[in-house]
Design a protein with these regions (language model features):
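Short, well-structured alpha-helical segments in soluble
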Residues: 130-142
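Intrinsically disordered, low-complexity proline-rich tandem-repeat tracts
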Residues: 659-662, 670
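A short, small-residue-rich loop immediately preceding and capping a beta-strand
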Residues: 139-160, 171-176
Length: 683
C-alpha cells in the first residue's frame, strides 16, 4: 500500500503579524526618516495611508512581508540597446542582486538615462548634466537605503557621481568594464585610439577603402567600454582613487567572469552600507585628499583630458569642497607625478594588459609615496588599509614583487616612468585662455617638438567651416601652422541657429582633434599644434590644446572675435579705430540678437544655454553646484588662473579685432599659451 505524500506546510513568515500590523497602527507615528519602505513616503496627507498604498502596490510584484522588511538596495540600471558599452548590464544586474540577497538585503533596480558617445546628438556631454539630475532625483525620491550605480560609458560615471554627491545617500559604483581588443591583419586593435590612427591613414591615402571597411568589424569585438586609457577607463580608475569603488573594480574586462564576481561583491558591499547606523555617505567619504589622490592617478595613468572637466564638476557638487580644487591643482600635481602606465594613447598597451599586470592595486602600490593613504573609501576602510590587503594577495606577489615579471613594462616604477611628469598640462598663464582651463595631453603628443612652438594661426569658425575648408588644396597652411577651431565650447556658436534653422547649443563636442589637412597628411605630416574651445576623445592623441576658456561664443573671449583686421602701424590704427569700432559694433549687435534669441530657447536647450558654466568649473549647470544658482562661476576663471602676464596688461574684451591670420600662437609648455600679432604684441 502506497503511503500518501507528505504534506509540506507553508513556510512561516519571518516577520510576525504584530510587526506587520504595526504599520497600520494609527496611534504609533511612522518614522519617516527610517529605513526600507518607510522612508520617503509620497504625500497623501496621511503617513499611514501612504505606507499602506506603497505596500499594496509593491506586493503586486509578488514581494512578501519578509522581503519588504529588509534593507533596500537600489540598483541604477543604465542598460540601453543604443549603448554597447553597457551591453553586459543584464548579467551584472543578476550578479549584483545575488550579492544583495546573499547578504540579507532586497535588491530593486530602476532605470535612468543611458548615454553613449556615438548615439547622442549633438554630443553626450550635452546630456551629462541631465543624466546627473535624473540620477540625483531618483535616488532622492525613492525608498532606498543604499544605491549601486552601474555605468561605464564616458559621461555616465561622472553624471552618476555628480548626482550621487548631491543626493548624498550611500552609493557605490560598479563599472561595466573595458571591452576586449580585436585583431586586424595579425595586429591587435581596439577602440578607439586605433579608430583614429587608422582613419588618419585612410585620409592620407595610406589605407584603402576595403581595409578600412574590414577594420570596422574588428575595432569593437565585444561589449564594454573602450579598451584603452580613454575617458571611460580613466574615470573607472579615478573612482577607485576617490574611494567610491572597491580597489579591484576598475579593470576587469566586461565579458569576464571576474567582472561578474566584482558585481556580486558590490552587492554585498551595498548591503553593508545600508545596514550601517552611521551612514557612509559620499559627502563624508570624499575629502580634499580624495581628490588629490584622484589627480595623482589621473597623471600617472595618462588619463583623458575630459577628466579635468568631470573632476571640476564633481568637486563643485560637494558643499565642503567646492572651489578648493581647480585646474591649477591638476597642473601642480602633474609636475611631481610621472606617467607610469604604458597604455594607448600615451603608450602601446590595452586595458586587458593593465588588468593582467595587477590593475589598480598594482598601480597604487607603486604610487604609495605620492598618495594620501588615510583617505576613506566606500568599504569603510582607508585607502592604505585597502592597499595593504590587496598587495598581500597572490596576484600582487606575482605582478608587483617579482623582478622578472614581463608585465612590468605595462606598470612602470617611479624610478623608470614612461614620461617624467605632467602627462596632462594645464595652461594657467597666457592670454588665450584666461579662464585657466586649457589642457594639453603632452604624453600623447606625436611630435614633442610641438610642445615649444610658434606658428601662424589658421582659424575655422565651427565644424561646418572646418569640413568645408580643411581639405581645400588652396588652404593657406603648412606643417608649422596652428589649426584653431572655435565655436565648439559648452554653448558654442551653432551654425544652424545663426541661420535660423532652430539648432541648439553645440554641447562642447569631441571635435577638438582637428584633422590634419589632407594635402599635408599626404606629405607625411601626422601631428600639428591644434587649439579649440571644445573637447577631444580621451582615446585620441596628438598635440592638441583643448577647453580654451572663455569659449568662443563669449564676445569677450579672444576666440570670440568674429572679424579680423590687425593693422601693424600705430598711426593707421589710431586713424581707423573709431570707424572700425562703429562698423564692428553694428555687426556684433546683429550677432548678439541671435545670442539673445538662444537665451530665450524653451525646454532643455534653453536651460542648458542659460545655466551651463565654463570648463574650469566643470561645464555643469550653476543651479546644480553646491553654491547654487546665486554663484555663477562663469567669470571666476581669470581670478583662479593667476600666473604671469605683462605689467599693466588686462585681458581684452575686444569686439573688433580678429582674423584668420596673421594671428600667431605661442605655446611654451608647460607654462604659457598666448596669441599675438606677427610683431609679438599680445592681443
Amino acid at each position: 500500500m502506497e503511503s500518501s505524500p507528505t504534506r509540506t506546510e507553508p513556510a512561516q513568515p519571518r516577520v510576525p503579524p504584530s510587526a506587520i500590523n504595526a504599520d497600520y497602527d494609527l496611534s504609533t507615528p511612522i518614522d519617516l526618516d527610517g529605513v526600507g519602505l518607510r522612508q520617503k513616503l509620497p504625500s497623501y496627507g496621511d503617513a499611514h495611508f501612504s505606507l499602506f498604498m506603497r505596500k499594496l502596490f509593491i506586493k503586486a510584484l509578488g514581494y512578501s512581508e519578509d522581503a519588504l522588511s529588509r534593507p533596500i538596495v537600489g540598483i541604477v540600471n543604465t542598460y540601453s540597446s543604443f549603448n554597447p558599452c553597457h551591453g553586459n548590464i543584464p548579467q551584472l544586474l543578476d550578479a549584483v542582486k545575488r550579492g544583495v540577497q546573499l547578504s540579507g538585503g532586497l535588491a530593486i533596480d530602476f532605470p535612468t538615462i543611458s548615454l553613449h558617445e556615438s548615439f547622442t546628438a549633438p554630443t553626450s556631454m550635452y546630456l551629462r548634466n541631465l543624466m546627473s539630475m535624473d540620477t540625483e532625483e531618483m535616488i532622492r525620491a525613492q525608498p532606498v537605503d543604499a544605491v549601486v550605480l552601474i555605468g561605464g560609458c564616458d559621461k555616465t560615471t561622472p553624471a552618476q557621481l555628480m548626482g550621487g554627491i548631491s543626493a548624498n545617500k550611500p552609493i557605490i559604483h560598479l563599472v561595466t568594464g573595458p571591452m576586449m581588443p580585436g585583431s586586424f591583419q595579425g595586429v591587435r586593435v581596439g577602440a578607439c585610439t586605433d579608430c583614429r590612427s587608422n582613419w588618419a591613414k585612410f585620409r592620407a591615402g595610406a589605407m584603402d577603402i576595403e581595409d578600412i571597411s574590414a577594420l570596422n568589424e574588428e575595432l569593437a569585438p565585444t561589449a564594454g567600454t573602450c579598451g584603452v586609457m580613454g575617458t571611460a577607463s580613466t574615470m573607472a580608475c579615478l573612482l577607485v582613487a576617490l574611494g567610491m569603488m572597491p580597489i579591484h573594480g576598475a579593470t576587469a574586462p566586461a565579458v569576464s567572469s571576474a567582472r561578474l564576481r566584482i558585481a556580486e561583491a558590490t552587492g554585498t558591499h551595498a548591503v553593508q552600507l545600508a545596514r550601517q547606523k552611521q551612514r557612509l555617505q559620499p559627502q563624508a567619504i570624499l575629502t580634499r585628499e580624495s581628490f588629490l589622490n584622484a589627480i595623482t592617478v589621473l597623471q600617472a595613468v595618462g588619463g583623458s583630458t575630459n577628466a579635468l572637466v568631470h573632476l571640476m564638476a564633481i568637486v563643485n557638487r560637494h558643499p565642503a569642497l567646492a572651489g578648493t580644487i581647480t585646474p591649477a591643482t591638476i597642473d601642480a600635481i602633474g609636475r611631481t607625478t610621472p606617467l607610469l602606465l604604458d597604455l594607448k594613447p600615451s603608450g602601446d598597451g590595452y586595458m586587458t594588459d593593465f588588468h593582467a599586470a595587477g590593475g589598480m592595486p598594482a598601480l597604487l602600490h607603486h604610487l604609495r609615496p605620492l598618495l594620501h593613504l588615510d583617505a576613506r573609501t566606500v568599504t569603510g576602510r582607508t585607502l592604505g588599509e585597502e592597499l595593504a590587503s590587496a598587495t598581500a594577495s597572490t596576484l600582487q606577489s606575482l605582478y608587483v614583487d617579482s623582478p622578472s615579471s614581463s608585465t612590468k613594462r605595462i606598470i612602470r616604477p617611479l624610478t623608470d616612468p614612461v614620461y617624467p611628469s605632467s602627462a596632462l598640462v594645464v595652461f594657467t598663464r597666457g592670454n588665450l585662455s584666461p579662464g585657466g582651463a586649457a589642457v594639453l595631453k603632452a604624453s600623447a603628443s606625436k611630435d614633442r617638438r610641438l610642445l615649444h612652438h610658434r606658428g601662424k594661426a589658421v582659424v575655422f569658425d565651427g565644424p561646418a567651416d572646418l569640413a568645408h575648408r580643411i581639405d581645400d588644396p588652396a588652404l593657406d597652411v603648412d606643417r608649422d601652422s596652428v589649426l584653431v577651431l572655435r565655436g565648439i565650447g559648452p554653448v558654442g556658436r551653432n551654425e544652424e541657429e545663426e541661420k535660423g534653422g532652430g539648432g541648439g547649443p553645440s554641447g562642447m563636442p569631441e571635435a577638438g582633434l582637428i584633422p590634419i589637412p589632407r594635402k599635408l597628411a599626404a606629405q607625411g605630416v601626422t601631428d600639428m599644434l591644434r587649439i579649440s574651445d571644445g573637447r577631444m576623445s580621451g582615446t585620441a592623441g596628438g598635440t592638441v590644446v583643448l577647453h580654451v576658456s572663455p569659449e568662443g561664443a563669449d564676445p569677450g573671449s579672444v576666440l570670440g572675435v568674429r572679424l579680423l583686421s590687425v593693422e601693424l602701424e600705430e598711426e593707421v590704427i589710431k586713424a581707423r579705430m573709431e570707424e572700425r569700432r562703429r562698423e564692428m559694433e553694428l555687426k556684433e549687435e546683429g550677432k548678439e540678437e541671435g545670442w539673445a534669441a538662444r537665451e530665450r530657447m524653451r525646454g532643455y536647450r534653453g536651460l542648458y544655454v542659460r545655466e551651463v558654466n565654463q570648463a574650469e568649473h566643470g561645464v555643469d549647470f550653476t543651479f546644480l553646484t553646491a553654491a547654487g544658482p546665486g554663484a555663477n562661476g562663469k567669470d571666476k576663471g581669470a581670478e583662479q588662473a593667476g600666473g604671469d602676464v605683462p605689467p599693466g596688461y588686462s585681458f581684452p574684451k575686444l569686439r573688433w579685432i580678429i582674423q584668420h591670420s596673421p594671428m600667431v600662437i605661442i605655446l611654451q609648455s608647460p607654462m604659457v599659451l598666448c596669441i599675438t600679432d606677427p610683431e609679438g604684441h599680445l592681443f
